[in-house]
């Protein structure tokens, strides 16, 4: 189910999501959820478009689900950031005026930030050479953006291969590198609200935090300021490198980051086997009071769920309330919901982001 873009119906759609979250969490005696709304338009900081040839020209195109041969041509995209909407016609004019930029271009990706940074990735069905690089450099300068060209097995970077975001959490501004191609939260305004909620929910602690699925350090940076130490895990090499840069950039020095899956971490904590990636890290020295999880849509697998059960507090951000409810059902005999929230990351769709703080009974 997906609703049409209609700002006048936003409140009704949000009410329906709140009702759905209440319904899913009711069996667990959840308190009333805090609700964090979204800007009604221009909230999405990244967008990806295929290009479609019509009347001898390439146009931005999107496709309805299951209709990959029926393009919807667009000139603007009201849910995308104002910066993306300003860049779209200028980029289109550039590829239409330049054979070098337009030839066999099939996809364009925009990444922008609340801090005003922007990056454009242009994907081609042909090799890219110095002639392309010359024109792309002129384009990047004219638009004030970084430009990345991608073709099979090759990537050319004009400027930087990341965008810089700055987010204010409880009066402190954190700076984030967002690498090209890596996951970032698409709705920057709601992401900032999410970070503030998590910061408040964890509280000021004298013990340590274990974070699973830390990504580029989106939550790691502010949460690290609330605890003694953090051990964070992530399996994506790109995200790990971004997180390490972000920790350094923000002078956050109480975090150790390791490339382990949740399953491997469970084995390490249970002393099933040693891991070379944990060399120099004494797991027994940590006094974990809270585990923070932000899993993919499938939620936590049963073994990871059992891993979280051993912690006094579980702070859980979910992009799928159904799998969140299933995980809580597995944990409800030992943990109860102390607070919960809905974050409207994805207006005009049925998708919702939610958060719960579970504490041991």
From Swiss-Prot:
CDD domains tied to this protein: AdoMet_MTases (cd02440)
Keyword Cytoplasm: no
EC number: 2.1.1.-, 2.1.1.35
Reaction(s) the record says it catalyses: uridine(54) in tRNA + S-adenosyl-L-methionine = 5-methyluridine(54) in tRNA + S-adenosyl-L-homocysteine + H(+); uridine(341) in tmRNA + S-adenosyl-L-methionine = 5-methyluridine(341) in tmRNA + S-adenosyl-L-homocysteine + H(+)
MF (Gene Ontology): rRNA binding; tRNA (uracil(54)-C5)-methyltransferase activity, S-adenosyl methionine-dependent; tRNA binding
Role played: Dual-specificity methyltransferase that catalyzes the formation of 5-methyluridine at position 54 (m5U54) in all tRNAs, and that of position 341 (m5U341) in tmRNA (transfer-mRNA).
Protein's name according to its UniProt entry: tRNA/tmRNA (uracil-C(5))-methyltransferase
Organism: Pseudomonas putida (strain ATCC 47054 / DSM 6125 / CFBP 8728 / NCIMB 11950 / KT2440)
């Amino acid at each position: 189910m997906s609703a049409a873009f209609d700002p006048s119906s936003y409140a009704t759609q949000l009410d329906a999501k709140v009702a759905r979250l209440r319904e899913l969490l009711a069996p667990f005696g959840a308190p009333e959820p805090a609700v964090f709304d979204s800007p009604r338009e221009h909230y999405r900081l990244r967008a990806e478009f295929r290009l479609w040839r019509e009347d001898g020209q390439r146009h931005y195109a999107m496709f309805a689900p299951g209709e990959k041969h029926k393009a919807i041509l667009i000139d603007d995209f009201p849910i995308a950031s104002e910066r993306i909407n300003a860049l779209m016609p200028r980029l289109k004019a550039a590829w239409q005026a330049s054979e070098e930029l337009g030839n066999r271009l099939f996809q364009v990706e925009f990444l922008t930030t609340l801090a005003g940074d922007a990056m454009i990735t242009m994907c081609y069905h042909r090799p890219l050479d110095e002639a392309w690089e010359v024109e792309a450099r002129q384009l990047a300068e004219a638009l004030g953006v970084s430009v990345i060209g991608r073709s099979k097995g090759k990537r050319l970077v004009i400027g930087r291969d990341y965008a810089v975001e700055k987010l204010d959490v409880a009066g402190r501004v954190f700076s984030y590198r967002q690498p090209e191609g890596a996951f970032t939260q698409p709705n920057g305004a709601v992401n900032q609200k999410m970070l503030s909620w998590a910061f408040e929910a964890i509280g000021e602690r004298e013990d340590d935090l274990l974070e699973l699925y830390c990504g580029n350090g989106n939550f790691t940076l502010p949460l690290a300021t609330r605890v003694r130490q953090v051990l964070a895990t992530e399996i994506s090499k790109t995200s790990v490198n971004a997180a390490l840069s972000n920790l350094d950039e923000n002078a956050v020095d109480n975090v150790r980051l390791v490339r382990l899956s949740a399953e491997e971490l469970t084995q390490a904590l249970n002393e099933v086997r040693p891991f070379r990636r944990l060399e120099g890290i004494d797991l027994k020295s940590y006094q974990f009071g809270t585990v923070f999880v932000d899993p993919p849509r499938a939620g936590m697998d049963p073994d990871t769920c059992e891993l979280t059960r051993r912690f006094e507090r579980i702070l859980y951000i979910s992009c799928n309330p159904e799998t969140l409810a299933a995980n809580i059902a597995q944990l409800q005999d030992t943990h109860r919901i102390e607070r919960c929230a809905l974050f409207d990351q994805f207006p005009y769709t049925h998708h919702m982001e939610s958060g719960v703080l579970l504490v041991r009974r």
